[in-house]
């Protein structure tokens, strides 16, 4: 872990703040730099920044300076900072700095939390699915949930658990992984994941639809060894990705034939397995519910036959 260093965090937004707070918790001296003025940030961010200042995190707004970069031993650059931003060139010119990545932050969180985690990705239905899962599991386990319903960012919420020492009071975490947040989740290991659907949305933030799909489907890279990814087989885009999927997965659906159209591209299921559900495989799912009290639940996973995707 990164400890006892002078760390410059570039960007005071939704990626930079939780990274800075975690690094400060690990006994680093942390300075957060942002090109914007404080009053230009959302009120919620301003409130969080005030709390972080009370914890010892330093902030400087209104621009970036070489003096701040040279002060640091290490730097974390928010993934939201454009690749051609002048500050990235300044960092390169500064020379020998330790570069802290989003993956470093995720792995550190993963190690400090030590809880089984369930993540929900996709375009529509993430909040509903997250809260349904939390509602079911909370009847038996001490869960913590982060979603739009709670108006909470998952990485900020997980860092809060670590900083406040609330981990021992929880058995597992359930959270929503929107397209913006999922980049900061790299390094986490999920016991289970869900992808609801992959229809076009927020396309002004992506160069093309394929980039949007890749970002949201990157939840597959967060699965822990033995973890299971649940995927909606009714979605033709998800169905097109099943053959190359290397993680343990279960495909669910109700047999609805759906079509996705975007910018001249049309995705549809060319065939579907009959009425209702047909099953293609049987497996065993082991759910690790707490490091100190592991409960292995064996259940037969019934998978849908992989429908064939046709793009016209």
From Swiss-Prot:
ATP binds at residues 112-118. Belongs to the MurCDEF family. It comes from Methanothermobacter thermautotrophicus (strain ATCC 29096 / DSM 1053 / JCM 10044 / NBRC 100330 / Delta H). One of its GO terms (biological process) is biosynthetic process. Pfam families: Mur_ligase_M (PF08245). One of its GO terms (molecular function) is UDP-N-acetylmuramoylalanine-D-glutamate ligase activity. InterPro entries: Mur-like_cat_sf (IPR036565), Mur_ligase_cen (IPR013221), MurD (IPR005762). This is Uncharacterized protein MTH_531. SUPFAM superfamilies: MurCD N-terminal domain, MurD-like peptide ligases, catalytic domain. Keywords: ATP-binding, Ligase, Nucleotide-binding. It comes from the Archaea. One of its GO terms (cellular component) is cytoplasm.
């Amino acid at each position: 872990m990164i400890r006892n260093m002078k760390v410059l965090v570039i960007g005071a937004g939704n990626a930079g703040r939780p990274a800075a707070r975690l690094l400060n918790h690990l006994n680093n001296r942390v300075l957060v730099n942002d090109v914007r003025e404080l009053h230009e940030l959302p009120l919620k961010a301003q409130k969080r920044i005030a709390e972080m200042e009370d914890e010892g995190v330093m902030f400087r707004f209104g621009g970036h300076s070489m003096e701040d970069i040279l002060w640091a031993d290490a730097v974390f650059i928010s993934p939201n900072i454009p690749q051609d931003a002048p500050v990235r060139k300044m960092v390169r010119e500064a020379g020998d700095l330790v570069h802290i990545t989003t993956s470093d932050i995720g792995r550190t969180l993963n190690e400090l939390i030590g809880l089984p985690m369930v993540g929900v990705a996709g375009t529509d239905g993430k909040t509903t699915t997250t809260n349904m899962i939390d509602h079911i599991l909370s009847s038996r386990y001490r869960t913590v949930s982060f979603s739009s319903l709670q108006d909470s960012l998952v990485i900020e919420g997980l860092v809060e658990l670590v900083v406040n020492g609330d981990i021992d009071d929880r058995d597992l975490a359930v959270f929503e992984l929107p397209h913006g947040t999922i980049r900061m989740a790299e390094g986490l290991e999920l016991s289970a994941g869900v992808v609801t659907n992959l229809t076009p949305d927020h396309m002004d933030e992506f160069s093309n639809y394929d980039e949007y799909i890749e970002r949201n489907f990157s939840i597959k890279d967060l699965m822990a060894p033995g973890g299971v990814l649940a995927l909606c087989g009714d979605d033709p885009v998800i169905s097109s990705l099943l053959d190359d999927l290397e993680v343990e997965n279960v495909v669910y659906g109700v047999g609805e034939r759906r079509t996705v159209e975007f910018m001249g591209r049309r995705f549809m299921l060319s065939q579907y397995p009959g009425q209702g559900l047909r099953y293609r495989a049987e497996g065993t799912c082991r759910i690790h519910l707490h490091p100190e009290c592991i409960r292995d639940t064996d259940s037969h996973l019934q998978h849908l036959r992989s429908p064939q995707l046709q793009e016209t």
